[in-house]
Amino acid sequence: MKTRFDKAKISGICVSVPEHKICIDDELESVFSNDIKTLKRMKKVIGLNTRYICDENTCVSDLGKHAANTLLQGLNIDKNSLDALIVVTQSPDFFMPSTACYLHQLLNLSSKTVAFDLGQACAGYLYGLFVAHSLIQSGLGKILLICGDTLSKFIHPKNMNLAPIFGDGVSATLIEKTDFNEAFFELGSDGKYFDKLIIPKGAMRIPKADIFNDDSLMQTEEFRQLENLYMDGANIFNMALESELKSFKEILEFSKVDEKDIAFHLFHQSNAYLVDCIKEELKLNDDKVPNFIMEKYANLSACSLPALLCELDTPKEFKASLSAFGAGLSWGSAVLNFKDLYTKDILIYTKEK
């Protein structure tokens, strides 16, 4: 699916991560059972170093509220002027109601501000931006997009294959109506591979072997039960590489934007080696492809792209391509124009005493 919008702009972005910081080197004994070779390999290939993890009482809404309030205050936005609040997450506070409605209360928004969730993972920022642009194209004025996850809650802390890879974080983005600003999107999904990245148990469907195409996800072990995240790492890597390469090429062709005019190519920060492979295959300049979020925050799921935008030193006006791939399977790319983008260094959320 490809589409173009011309009525919306991204005015600002803030990202919040929890205060508990973990360094992978400190987990040599507790997580890696003194397997120094595996630890060093994960650091080198995936790009891991530190990550931030929520405690049991901190959820998406807490980080979202922190990021949203900071953003709205920084932009001097009247909360009553917001037309919609969208929360994109795979780790909601509750099954019912939506996290957006709960956050609506926490932010003390007007009853005229519609609130709803979108269930997307690593490609979720692009899906959220797509929906926000669609709504503004139809006449809305201001949309607050909250995007991110607390996936550490679905991973056993001693699972050395997954625990070091995922960090927690949530972004807040303000999208506003403007006179003219082109934005191009290319999105896709393939449900045949729904079980390649999945939490099999915990919702309404009872997990049974005949439901899944991947037999190995039903094979539990000491540090992975059916309530925990399962990832077919090798296949996910290969499909992410193929999908992001194809999506990137298609969005450039569709937008008719010259690659030389794009300041940054932002790829979902799930694996430093994967980003390097994409960059080399597309023959992109190193300085256009930032690749450092994994080292500082690990895989922030749908929050990794907004985290990149917050951490980059961007000019007053620039074009960027954004690409991501995640559970579903879902993927997407966009070419966006930015002007006077408000950002702050990534925020550390401290629980209120």
Question: Where in the sequence are the language-model features?
Answer:
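Condensing-enzyme catalytic core mediating Claisen C-C bond formation in acyl metabolism
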Residues: 1-56, 159-238, 337-353
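Membrane helical hairpin/interfacial module
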Residues: 83-91
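Phosphate/pyrophosphate-binding loops at sites that engage ATP/ADP/AMP, CoA/4′-phosphopantetheine
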Residues: 67-83, 245-263, 312-313
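Claisen-condensing/thiolase-fold acyl-transfer catalytic domains that form or cleave C-C bonds
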Residues: 61, 65, 91-92, 105, ...
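Acidic-glycine-rich active-site phosphate/pyrophosphate-binding loop
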Residues: 35-41, 94-108, 145-151, 216-220, ...
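Short beta-strand segments
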Residues: 11-14, 88, 119, 143-149, ...
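Flexible, glycine-rich active-site loops centered on histidine and acidic residues
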Residues: 141-170
